[in-house]
Design a protein with these regions (language model features):
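Residue-level signal for inorganic ion chemistry
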Residues: 20, 113, 163, 323, ...
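A short, flexible beta-alpha/helix-coil linker loop
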Residues: 118-120, 179-180, 325-329
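C-terminal edge-of-domain segments
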Residues: 161-173, 389
Length: 399
């Protein structure tokens, strides 16, 4: 068994834990990891404490394959190669050279090193990286080519190795994912301020959508939320159409991987509930349609160009999951306040009894909707601190 670590955006740890539990990779009850209470009684979220930025779990390398294929809310899956104390450079190099690098690196494979040092005697990150690279060369008999890690290199990404030194305790991990897991392979067309697929999936999960009732995104942009919802409802794995770093490892089990993909393909369903995406930006709608086409779900989503005031929800109740404009996306604060007030008015007029989930960077804007949102979950989007919040649009009492 290996120690594995699912990296995720801070705030999304409970969702990653829930997914791992559903995959049988964590021996826990998902409801104990993320408890979402009814908004009618004052919604709140409770989660156990996690290491910020990820979930550690145990499994085989085959389990690492599965995690990469299925996880929707994680950014990477790391394999822990070793953990040891090192207070001197010779000690660091000696102990690093004992790790089984030959299982993960072909002799010609280039590497990239990501090093962080905190409260340790070895504090110079560049020097630590040099010793680790040297130790890999000691083990393999040939020093690896070391390159800078750049996500936009695509298939030419070097093998990423992550080194952390905290209080002289060194943890060395190797990345099994390659490109970040939010890169599903379908979003080539983008609109302004695109939403990462991992956060979009977390929003759909947090909403409590039952995958039976309709789902609407009235600020859909390039379509990430509708596409992720369609993939989720259709049981299409998040990584079904992409490559991973582990495919280049010397002992990659292609037979197991092919069987895993075949089983995943058999589980895909074509009949999914009504999903609607709308946006006033015609260019965004064109991008959304192109992305849905590449994801193979264009026939399952209805996109239309219309302002929030003109939305036409299907008979419900259903779910609204959306990422309205905020932060740097709109320069005029007054315009934002008016937009959020209008959003709330439209929800009360057209979506009574519907569940609403959204993210926003300012509590005051959330209040401007006039909807009874919960306190939500703090997380990040595009470098901004945001809150993922939920509400239920109440139906007026009849006398």
């Amino acid at each position: 068994m290996e120690k594995l670590f699912a990296v995720c955006t801070p705030g999304l740890e409970p969702f990653a834990a829930q997914e791992l539990s559903q995959l049988g990779l964590m021996d826990c009850d998902p409801s104990a990891r993320l408890k979402i209470f009814s908004t009618e009684s004052g919604a709140s979220y409770e989660s156990v404490d996690y290491e910020p930025g990820g979930i550690e779990f145990q499994g085989s390398l085959h389990d690492a394959y599965r995690a990469n294929l299925y996880l929707r809310t994680a950014s990477r899956v790391l394999v822990r190669l070793g953990q040891f104390y090192a207070a001197e450079f010779p000690e660091l190099r000696r102990k690093t050279s004992r790790l089984p690098w030959e299982n993960y690196l072909a002799p010609e494979r280039s590497i990239a090193l990501r090093v962080t040092c905190q409260t340790s005697r070895l504090y110079h990150e560049t020097a630590v990286a040099e010793r680790v690279a040297g130790a890999i060369g000691d083990r393999l008999g040939k020093p690896p080519a070391v390159h800078k890690y750049q996500e936009d290199l695509g298939a030419d990404l070097p093998q990423l190795i992550v080194v952390r030194l905290v209080d002289n305790l060194c943890t060395i991990s190797i990345d099994s994912s390659g490109a970040l897991l939010h890169r599903r392979g379908y979003r080539l067309a983008t609109a302004k301020a695109p939403l990462r697929e991992t956060l979009a999936s977390a929003m759909v999960m947090a909403s409590g959508w039952n995958k039976i009732s309709p789902l609407l995104d009235p600020f859909c942009g390039s379509g990430t939320i509708p596409v992720e919802a369609a993939l989720m409802a259709g049981r299409v794995p998040a990584g079904y159409c992409r490559r991973f770093a582990f495919m280049d490892w010397p002992h990659f089990d292609s037979t197991f991987w092919d069987a895993l993909l075949a089983d995943a393909g058999k589980a895909i369903v074509s009949e999914i509930p009504k999903i609607i995406g709308s946006d006033r930006d015609a260019g965004a709608i064109r991008a959304a349609q192109a992305n849905a086409e590449r994801a193979g779900v264009a026939g399952s989503i209805e996109f239309s160009g219309r302002a929030i005031s003109a939305i036409d929800p299907p008979s419900g109740p259903g779910w609204v999951v959306t990422n309205p404009p905020y932060g740097k996306r709109v320069s005029q604060t007054k315009d934002l306040r008016n937009l959020y007030a209008q959003f709330g008015n439209v929800m009360r007029a057209k979506c009574r009894g519907w569940h609403v989930t959204m993210i926003c960077d300012r509590v005051q804007l959330i209040r401007n909707t006039g909807l009874d949102f919960d306190q939500g979950i703090p997380t990040m989007n595009g470098g901004l601190k945001v809150r993922l919040v939920r509400s239920l649009v109440k139906t007026p009492l009849t006398s």
